[in-house]
């Protein structure tokens, strides 16, 4: 396969570039890899991309080549000097494969020099050819030239054009060439035309394309060769103003097939590209293009895809070759056994035919051995007898006394001597070759011919046996070989069927993986750390400081959210939000988990909080006198801290489904409200609790407590919605400090029913008689709230329930509405002081004190408090805080209390704004205005959704996000059996988003390397009973490098039945 330009190719493409690109200005310079660069050129009505590959090629391209995320230093230097400059000329230096591109004129000119020979090079120089930057530093010792920055590029050292070879010089060259060398190889180093053009000219002059140098070349032949050289020079001149066509020469490869009846398929692959259609290619398949530049672009752009085809073809050939080798091996074994049977049978028959001679020979040798004659003397005696014409001695060909055998040459005595060929000795079979041993024996046995009965045969005769016994021994060998042949045939059939089945499976896998790799589309976000949240938001993060910089500069757009953690190595995460609507809390928490897991917290196993800000709060402008390094940004304004996240990631696969199947998966990752998400929430919470908090497995109330609960009519609604564990959580939550320093304690005082009802109607929008279940999981969205009318209508039935009011709220209400006695007021103020002084004490102790101070405990509460103290006696403050953060138990009630407190204040009293502290419960949506809580806005949105049953939010989002959301809908972790699956993409994301995924494993900090962990997870998926054949094929097609690239550090893999899969 042709891989680089020849001189003819270079001149042809330069002629086309000069005709199309001169006068265009450089828009930008990009690097594809360390050897390939793209120069974007433009003029008012035309744009073009010039591709340069050091040592290989130069051409324009219409294909989209992948560019490096961060431009290299060479590309940056080219941008600095070449950007916005006009391309003035593109010329070849001498006849060497060196191109000089000049950008700009006179002293403002810069030269970009590309070397297309040897290892290649790209050099940027100024107008005096002083090197400003160079791709590959080197020293040319032969010319004493150093290629380095600030050195002068030696343009005068390029190979100059030489006069045509003379007849005398050509004769000398051919005479000095080694005999048998191909003629075009002899001429190629002397001429600048390239082997293809030389071969074409040789064919045109009547030579063979592979003509060799030998003694038969006469003077007239050398003259013909000289004519060939002149023709090649004419072609080279044509390329100076080339405006012809381009040709890609194809190679036809036969695709192997297991079916003999099926016609063989041909695969056409690109082999060469040329500006002319040469004579040697007339019989080959080829593709014609309107220009050579387009032919080269097509050749190199499709070569990668064809490499996949060729690799698959080689794998198929290798698989079929193995099957063919198995078949031939069994055939050779059977043939060797058949021959062994025939030889043993013939030897037995020859011994029977020559009984007297064999018996006589056995007796003579036995007698000599019995007389203790030396073995050497016995040999001498045999030779003397042979010289005298003794028939017995003539039959003995060799004495093998060390093995107690004699080799005899036996003939069929019933055949006339004329029937025996004179060269019978040449076909004598060696009796030692009873069975093939080793590869050499196998090769010899392939050439063995059938033994002929009329030919003499060498037979080994055992001296310890009689002639008949020796014949019987050979017949026994024959019978044993027959049985062995039968067993071999049966085993061969089984082995061949197994090999054939395995080969078919291999061929199928190769074809499937090849088709998947071709269909596989690499999305723009895969170069980053990424995942799609449980609510269909794309979250991307940088792998390093450079990618962090790029993400903020290029991909942080208005409406997006920036998420980070104050830890070393933490990635900068961006939540893409094309609609501009408020990001749900669950997605924010998942992005925070990602920021933490891709930081030093993973290896240190530290649980902490991430934070988020709006896009306009992120800036690269540093304060006066300070400098921001790469990947560092200035955050202006308030940071909104998220709840602490557990270091828990998951590994899974997203399947790309066909467009016809996308409708099945719309809404899989929509923003869910309480009624829709309760089942998912419960299962996910139970899974997390079981895996991470085994100490909280209990919590069921006893029969006595259940009876006590049912015995309290005023608390029926409350107690039937929460278990004792929830009570403990609420008890610990009640005394958590608020943002402004006040302790928002939940009071258990029971107000009179009439007063309760009156305050409820005037002050509160919702009666506090139900338990908000959003604390069960910190990531889930806020639940729906009942409409005001419904809550007002249900006041009578709910007025007996207990409301939890802070001391401040009750104080304000009593000032506003009820004249209270001074004693009662003093009691309330004392309670306030007690709560403020006890902010950081244990939650269940505070709760018990407050209940005791307010009023006597109700029936059953004393025993409950005693059991709660016993259950949580081993918990310290840190453990309790972690549990509270996991369950997010204070989230929704705080917001409700805040709203209630504001409505309870007089209108002329300003609402007190809490200070900005790093708490997950408060998130800012607008920095300019008074910051409403994110949860409050989410409640308002959900209220609208409740009021309008025909919510068209999903359709609105679809219109806003367009193709991007369609893409996310086509990537699913829950493939349907009837889906048409295109390919699979490995994904590493917070484990909470994978609740409904078909395949998933949990990753936590551990000691296993990520490559091995990815293979363990893949092996688990492959052995899953639910895995279909297509899904397994998709798993196999994923490259090993793509599997583990997003896994954070060293991990521990956890999944159901993982140990059972490993044993398999």
UniProtKB/Swiss-Prot annotation:
Residue list for modification Phosphoserine: 417, 737
Domain of life: Eukaryota
Subcellular localization(s) per the UniProt record: Cytoplasm, Cytosol; Nucleus
Positions with biased composition (Acidic residues): 694-707
Positions of modified residues (Phosphothreonine): 7
Biased composition (Basic and acidic residues): 731-756, 828-839, 947-959
Key words of the record: Coiled coil, Cytoplasm, Nucleus, Phosphoprotein
Database matches in Gene3D superfamilies: ibrinogen binding protein from staphylococcus aureus domain
Disordered: region residues: 420-451, 694-718, 731-973
Basic residues compositional bias, start-end: 438-447, 859-870
GO cellular component: cytosol; cytosolic ribosome; nucleus; RQC complex
Polar residues biased stretches: 771-781, 960-973
Coiled-coil intervals, chain numbering: 296-359, 481-512, 858-882
GO BP annotations, alphabetical order: CAT tailing; nuclear export; protein-containing complex assembly; ribosome-associated ubiquitin-dependent protein catabolic process
Oligomeric and partner information: Component of the ribosome quality control complex (RQC), composed of the E3 ubiquitin ligase LTN1, TCF25 and NEMF associated with the 60S ribosomal subunit. The complex probably also contains VCP/p97 and its ubiquitin-binding cofactors. Interacts (via its N-terminus) with XPO1.
Protein family: Belongs to the NEMF family.
Protein name: Ribosome quality control complex subunit NEMF
Species of origin: Mus musculus
Gene of this entry: Nemf
């Amino acid at each position: 396969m042709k891989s680089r330009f020849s001189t003819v190719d270079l001149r042809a493409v330069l002629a086309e570039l000069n005709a199309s690109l001169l006068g265009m200005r450089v828009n930008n310079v990009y690097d594809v890899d360390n050897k390939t660069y793209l120069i974007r050129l433009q003029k008012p009505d035309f744009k073009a991309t010039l591709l340069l590959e050091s040592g290989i090629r130069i051409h324009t391209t219409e294909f989209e080549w992948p560019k490096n995320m961060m431009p290299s230093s060479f590309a940056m230097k080219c941008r600095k000097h070449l950007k916005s400059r006009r391309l003035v000329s593109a010329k070849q230096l001498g006849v060497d494969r060196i191109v000089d591109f000049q950008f700009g004129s006179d002293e403002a000119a810069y030269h970009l020099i590309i070397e297309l020979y040897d290892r290649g090079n790209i050099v940027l120089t100024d107008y005096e050819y002083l090197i400003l930057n160079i791709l590959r530093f080197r020293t040319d010792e032969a010319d004493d030239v150093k290629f380095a920055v600030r050195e002068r590029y030696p343009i005068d050292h390029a190979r100059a054009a030489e006069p045509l070879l003379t007849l005398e010089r050509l004769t000398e060259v051919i005479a000095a060439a080694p005999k048998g060398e191909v003629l075009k190889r002899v001429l190629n180093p002397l001429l600048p035309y390239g082997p293809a053009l030389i071969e074409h000219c040789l064919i045109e002059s009547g030579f063979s394309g592979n003509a060799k140098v030998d003694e038969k070349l006469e003077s007239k032949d050398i003259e013909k060769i000289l004519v060939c050289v002149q023709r090649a020079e004419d072609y080279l001149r044509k390329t100076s103003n080339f405006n012809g066509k381009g040709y890609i020469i194809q190679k036809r490869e036969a695709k192997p097939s297991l079916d003999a009846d099926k016609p063989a398929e041909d695969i056409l692959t690109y082999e060469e590209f040329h500006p002319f259609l040469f004579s040697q290619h007339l019989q080959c398949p080829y593709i014609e293009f309107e220009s050579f530049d387009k032919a080269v672009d097509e050749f190199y752009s499709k070569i990668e895809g064809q490499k996949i085809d060729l690799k698959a073809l080689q794998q198929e050939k290798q698989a079929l070759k193995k099957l063919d080798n198995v078949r031939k091996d069994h055939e050779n074994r059977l043939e060797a056994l058949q021959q062994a049977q025939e030889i043993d049978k013939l030897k037995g028959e020859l011994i029977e035919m020559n009984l007297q001679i064999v018996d006589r020979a056995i007796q003579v040798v036995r007698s000599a051995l019995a007389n203790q004659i030396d073995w050497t003397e016995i040999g001498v005696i045999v030779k003397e007898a042979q010289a005298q014409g003794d028939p017995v001695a003539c039959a003995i060909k060799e004495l093998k006394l060390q093995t107690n055998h004699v080799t005899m040459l036996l003939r069929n005595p019933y055949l006339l001597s004329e029937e025996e060929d004179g060269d019978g000795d040449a076909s004598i079979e060696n009796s030692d070759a009873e069975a093939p041993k080793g590869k050499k024996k196998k090769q010899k046995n392939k050439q063995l011919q059938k033994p002929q009965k009329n030919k003499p045969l060498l037979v080994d005769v055992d001296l310890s046996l009689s002639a008949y016994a020796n014949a019987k021994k050979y017949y026994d060998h024959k019978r044993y070989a027959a049985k062995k042949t039968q067993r071999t045939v049966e085993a061969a059939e089984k082995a061949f069927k197994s090999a054939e089945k395995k080969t078919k499976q291999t061929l199928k896998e190769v074809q499937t993986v090849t088709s998947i790799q071709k269909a596989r589309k690499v999305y723009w976000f895969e170069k980053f750390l990424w995942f799609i949240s449980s609510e269909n938001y794309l979250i991307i993060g940088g792998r390093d400081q450079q990618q962090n910089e790029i993400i903020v500069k290029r991909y942080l757009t208005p409406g997006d959210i920036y998420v980070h953690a104050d830890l070393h190595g933490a990635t900068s995460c961006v939540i893409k939000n094309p609609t501009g609507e408020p990001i749900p809390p669950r997605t924010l928490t998942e992005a925070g988990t990602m920021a933490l897991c891709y930081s030093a917290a993973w290896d240190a196993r530290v649980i902490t909080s991430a934070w988020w800000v709006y896009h306009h709060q992120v800036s690269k402008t540093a304060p006066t006198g300070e400098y921001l390094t790469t990947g560092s940004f200035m955050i202006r304004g308030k940071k909104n801290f998220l709840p602490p996240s557990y270091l828990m990631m998951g590994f899974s696969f997203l399947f790309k489904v066909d467009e016809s199947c996308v409708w099945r998966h719309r809404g899989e990752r929509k923003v869910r409200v309480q009624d829709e998400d309760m089942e998912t929430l419960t299962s996910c919470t139970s899974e997390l609790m079981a895996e991470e908090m085994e100490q909280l497995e209990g919590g069921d109330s006893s029969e006595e407590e259940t009876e006590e609960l049912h015995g309290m009519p005023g608390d029926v609604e409350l107690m039937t919605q929460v278990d004792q564990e929830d009570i403990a959580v609420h008890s610990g939550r009640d005394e958590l400090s608020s943002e402004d320093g006040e302790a928002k304690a939940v009071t258990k005082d029971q107000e009179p029913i009439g007063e309760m009802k009156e305050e409820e109607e005037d002050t509160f929008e919702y009666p506090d008689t139900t338990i908000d279940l959003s604390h069960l999981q910190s990531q889930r969205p806020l639940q729906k709230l009942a409409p005001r009318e419904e809550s007002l209508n249900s006041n009578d039935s709910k007025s007996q329930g207990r409301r939890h009011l802070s001391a401040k709220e009750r104080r304000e209400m009593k000032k506003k509405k009820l004249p209270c006695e001074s004693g009662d007021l003093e009691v309330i103020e004392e309670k306030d002081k007690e709560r403020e002084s006890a902010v950081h004490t244990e939650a269940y102790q505070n709760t018990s004190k407050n209940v005791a101070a307010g009023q006597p405990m109700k029936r059953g509460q004393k025993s409950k408090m005693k059991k709660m103290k016993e259950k949580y006696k081993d918990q310290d403050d840190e453990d309790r805080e972690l549990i509270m953060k996991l369950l997010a138990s204070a989230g929704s009630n705080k917001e409700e209390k805040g709203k209630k407190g504001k409505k309870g204040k007089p209108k002329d009293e300003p609402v007190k704004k809490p200070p900005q502290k790093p708490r997950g419960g408060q998130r800012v949506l607008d920095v300019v205005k008074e910051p409403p809580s994110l949860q409050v806005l989410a409640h308002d949105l959900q209220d609208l959704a409740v009021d309008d049953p025909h919510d068209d939010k999903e359709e609105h989002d679809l219109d806003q996000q367009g193709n991007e959301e369609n893409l996310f809908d086509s990537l699913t972790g829950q493939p349907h059996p009837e889906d048409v699956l295109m390919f699979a993409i490995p994904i590493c994301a917070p484990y909470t988003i994978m609740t409904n995924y078909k395949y998933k494993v949990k990753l936590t900090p551990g000691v296993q390397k990520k490559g091995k962990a990815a293979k363990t997870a893949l092996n688990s998926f492959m052995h899953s009973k639910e895995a279909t054949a297509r899904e397994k094929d998709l798993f196999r097609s994923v490259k090993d490098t793509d599997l583990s690239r997003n896994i954070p550090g060293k991990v521990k893999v956890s999944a159901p039945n993982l140990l059972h899969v490993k044993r398999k």
